[in-house]
Design a protein with these regions (language model features):
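Predominantly soluble domains enriched in secretory-pathway, periplasmic, or organellar proteins
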Residues: 1-154
Length: 154
């Protein structure tokens, strides 16, 4: 849910023969919540996080990186996509390739840095964001496959 509480974005993930590669935008301002948009992101959308100011939402997609290399939809890397948020309108701003089988994503308090989990590499990708460009600037190795990530408010 956005920090303002007026819109929610959810990933669509489920068991079926194909992939559900989308996110839904939900308007929370009316009498009852309702889906107002469905957007394609990439294969197997995993997680999302709003920036602290609510102006952006970052979404992770495995994008085939957790598949066997022989699979026709295999990709070497997962994906982080950033959308700008204007009410219930989301516009894709930037994307960056990260590690394999990526999962969670979090924003820094100032909205300039993101961390994305890469389960297969036992690592977190460090990404910088300037409002237009998203790029990987480093990596933090961890002892196990990172599968849950949040920030602590201070």
């Amino acid at each position: 849910m956005s920090p303002k509480g007026d819109v929610a974005v959810v990933v669509n993930q489920g068991g079926n023969a194909g992939d559900i590669d989308t996110i839904n935008v939900i308007d929370l301002k009316g009498k009852a919540p309702r889906i107002v948009r469905t957007l394609d992101v990439g294969q197997i959308v995993e997680d999302l996080a709003f920036s602290n100011d609510g102006n952006y939402v970052a979404v992770t997609a495995q994008d085939g990186s957790a598949r066997a290399p022989s699979h026709p939809f295999y990709n070497d890397n997962g994906l982080v996509v950033v959308f700008s948020v204007n009410g219930t309108n989301l516009t894709k701003v930037a994307e960056a390739r990260v590690g394999k089988w990526n999962q969670g994503v979090v924003w820094s308090r100032d909205g300039k840095t993101l961390l994305a989990q890469n389960m297969a590499e036992n690592a977190l990708s460090i990404l910088s964001f300037d409002g237009k460009t998203l790029r990987v600037t480093g990596e933090i190795k961890v002892k196990g496959g990172p599968a849950g990530l949040r920030t602590a408010e201070r």
